[in-house]
From Swiss-Prot:
Pfam families, A to Z: Ribosomal_L9_C (PF03948), Ribosomal_L9_N (PF01281)
Organism field: Shewanella sediminis (strain HAW-EB3)
Gene Ontology process terms (BP): translation
InterPro entries: Ribosomal_bL9, Ribosomal_bL9/RNase_H1_N, Ribosomal_bL9_bac/chp, Ribosomal_bL9_C, Ribosomal_bL9_C_sf, Ribosomal_bL9_N, Ribosomal_bL9_N_sf
Keyword Protein biosynthesis: no
Coiled-coil regions listed in the entry: none
Top-level taxon: Bacteria
UniProt entry tagged with the keyword Cell membrane: no
Function: Binds to the 23S rRNA.
Official protein name in the record: Large ribosomal subunit protein bL9
Encoding gene, per UniProt annotation: rplI
Sorted UniProt keywords: Ribonucleoprotein, Ribosomal protein, RNA-binding, rRNA-binding
């Protein structure tokens, strides 16, 4: 199924690209989310008429994401206290939600889906640098300090 992308989508294309995708992906994800329209003559004409508006929206989203990333990078080290054993091993773990809640409490809104922990949840005390993907093109780093609770 051919679709016209209304947004930049990782591993697929940019705004305005006409791409061939599987019908299920288009019907179940791209079309309901408003990220694409079916590529036919009528939709192509409508898209070309709205292209400038969509590009301006994309630029505005990118600018807002850059501003959020700067705020996140400007944060001091965020401290999360958790119960831990004598050797620094946590009873439990620090996951995406815990990190997102701590950053939000520090004053910058952050969703748990934006936090990237490629090695899984944090299970020891110490200093960590956690990557946050604010936008498909914008990433930020959060300095995190996990300490043992008294």
């Amino acid at each position: 199924m051919n679709v016209i992308l209304l947004d930049k989508i990782a591993n697929l294309g940019n705004l305005g690209d006409q791409v061939a995708v599987k019908a299920g992906y288009a019907r179940n994800f791209l079309l309901p989310q408003g990220k694409a329209v079916v590529a036919n003559t009528a939709n192509t004409e409508v898209f070309e008429a709205r292209r400038a508006e969509l590009e301006a929206k994309l630029v505005a989203d990118l600018t807002a994401a850059n501003e959020r990333a700067e705020k996140i990078n400007a944060l001091e080290s965020i401290v999360i206290a958790s119960k831990a054993g004598d050797e620094g091993k946590l009873f439990g773990s620090i996951g995406n939600r815990d990190i997102a809640d701590a950053v939000t409490a520090a004053g910058v809104e952050l969703a748990k889906s934006e936090v990237r922990l490629p090695l899984g949840a944090l299970r020891t005390t110490g200093e960590f640098e956690v990557e946050v993907q604010v936008h498909t093109e914008v990433k930020a780093i959060v300095k995190l300090s996990v300490v043992a609770e008294d």
